[in-house]
């Protein structure tokens, strides 16, 4: 069942990524990048969860963690282009991109260095991961991701309070999904379960973002987009 669920989610994420291609506008471009990275992250998750080789599993886990760095950046840019926030922090964005590049290298190289984590055993239901919890890169990775998520959540709270109903519904759905995922991730961070909450949430977020940004039209707005008899 778990394998089937992963297949279905990957197919849906792939469809969202393909359908995002060719859409016009900066926000649509950010959605395309987010969908693509989320899809690639899902592939690494699938290999991590179901390929029974410690070296491959270690590499895929590192690549999966590297994807998180770029997903939070893309989520920040999505927030910027959908809400208008985060425009005047160019230096911060450059610092985030540089950190993500270095962190991605460290996470992928972990398959040889084991500076962040080591996978000691793979069973049918568990993957035993031993994190280097006092290590700089372990702490920096998780602290960076959690801080960015908290900032984005605060931004959406601000926008929900001031936006019209048309936009507030979108912000509320994204906020609730991200907030629930954040809490679940904090609650299960020490779990040895194969299923990584972060990847599941980012995958679910990719489908919600695609739908709300490029597909969703409220019933009250359909008269603005449906063709009239004269147009038909």
Where are these regions (language model features)?
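Hydrophobic alpha-helical transmembrane segments of multi-pass membrane proteins
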Residues: 5-53, 60-77, 96-112, 174-190
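Membrane-interface helix-boundary motifs at transmembrane edges
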Residues: 18-31, 80-92, 160-170
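Membrane-interfacial loop-to-transmembrane-helix junctions in polytopic alpha-helical membrane proteins
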Residues: 23-27, 53-59, 88-91, 133-140, ...
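Alpha-helical transmembrane segments in multipass membrane proteins, preferentially the mid-helix core
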Residues: 13-16, 74-78, 142-165, 211-213
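Conserved small/polar residues in nucleotide/adenosyl-binding loops
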Residues: 2-10, 222-228
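Interfacial "cap-and-anchor" motif at the non-cytosolic start of specific transmembrane alpha-helices
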Residues: 45, 162-224
